[in-house]
Amino acid sequence: MQPLSKLMAISKPQNLSLHEQREVLRADMCWQQETIPVMETHDSEASRQKFRHFQYLKVSGPHEALSQLRELCLQWLRPEIHTKKQIIEQLVLEQFLAILPEEVRTWVHLQHPNNSEDMVTLIEDVIEMLEDEGMPCKDSAPQMGSIKEKMKAGSPTGKPQEPVTFKDVVVEFSKEEWGQLDSAVKNLYRNVMLENFRNLNSLRKAHLLSKPFESLKLESRKKRWIMEKEIPRKTIFDMKSISGEESSHGVIVTRLTESGHPSSDVWKGENWLYRNQKKWDINLPQEAFIPETSYTDEEDFECSENKETFDINSVSSICAIQQGIPSRKGSPKCDKFKTQFKFNLDSVGKQHSEYEYVNDLSLRTDIRHQKSHTTMNSYECYQCGKAFCRSSSLIRHQIIHTGEKPYKCSECGRFFNRRTNLTKHQKLHAEVKACTSNKCGKAVSKSEDGNNPALHFGNNFYECVNCGKSFNRSSSLIRHQMIHTGEKPFKCKECNKAFNRSSNLVKHQKLHTRDKS
């Protein structure tokens, strides 16, 4: 191994003569043979270059590209003759040399280290020697003093900088470009923009904390938030147009709501950002929502009976609808039902005001609430929750849950849960009595045929006057009497043959159909 003092005599690689460069390459090949004696280095470098500089455009598809890369890697590393340790050592040495500065890489080749540990020891010795001699890095031939700086290139140093604005990180689209994006890309754009804004907001807070109190006081007086779009109709207040100095807060609200960028159905206006600031951990300015109408009282807008809370578009219009009188200054009320219209106004000593949505009800819901004053069901069943407008209806309904049957038939002892059912039952008893007392066999109507077996007690109430045969249905008695009278009311239209039953006529007509076929 060459002495360390020889390092100072080595110039940059681009200043080496052709003979010296060839000497470096020859020494490099000899060093590889000494490091891994088992490896055959005749075509190792050529195979490595083919593997490292392989291009995808030279093949027809991904499968062929992967296959060729695998083949080139096998030709370079030769796993059939090299051990895993040798292959790993070769890969580590290659990568370590690649990350070194160019002048250091050339010098390391000339030293012929046996392994990666020797290479690290060489570099540490050179750095220590240069620091001891106090040699300036700029004047030295190999410029070894810059090694530490290049190793620490990723570490942030220097004085703190001013926080960047949203303009520095925003990605802009034209109207045509935005229209061609699908919903997934638009959602991704939204997430990235909100994430950038959250990061910028945190940087802004840290920057403000480092400023003196007086400068913060002056800056707070000059700030104005830029809000270009109008708040949707469903919001409570009319937003004031506020212009002023551009800030990161104002830029994101302006950027994300102007036409050509995320449309109203995606962002739902500025109101969408304010409703979601807790979800995204961002703090948007509240100055833009200072109401034009100020209330001196902090009393809630309420309806005194059912204690419901509404979100309204216009307090005065709702009170006019509910009470039919113009609203007065102060806290509007519906004195009949005490419906609350809730505001939280706290502008004393603060730069912003807050309001909260209690229920997302529209104006139509408020009108329906007024109509419900006259149709409210105030009698509710405690078991199933069903409500009724009359107490008598609730009492009848509760009989279903208790299973109570308070109405009893005095003749047969049967119970019913409703008086109407008992009345119908008693009418059947009266009809049965009239039928049994009149033994004339006269057929009664179908509703009086006594289909309820509990009333009949097994007796047939329809008796034939000719033969004394009885039936439990009037229709059966009528069909039976046709036998005695010889009546045949069912006549065939083709052959004029008559039958006393419709079923016999149907069978006869099937014979005609069979003969025709």
From Swiss-Prot:
Domain KRAB residue range list: 164-237
Transmembrane parts of this sequence: none
Swiss-Prot/TrEMBL keywords: DNA-binding, Metal-binding, Nucleus, Repeat, Transcription, Transcription regulation, Zinc, Zinc-finger
A Gene Ontology molecular function term of the record: RNA polymerase II cis-regulatory region sequence-specific DNA binding
One GO location term (cellular component): nucleus
Compartments where located: Nucleus
Pfam families: KRAB, SCAN, zf-C2H2
Function: May be involved in transcriptional regulation.
UniProt record similarity statement: Belongs to the krueppel C2H2-type zinc-finger protein family.
Protein's name in the database: Zinc finger protein 215
Organism: Pongo abelii (Sumatran orangutan)
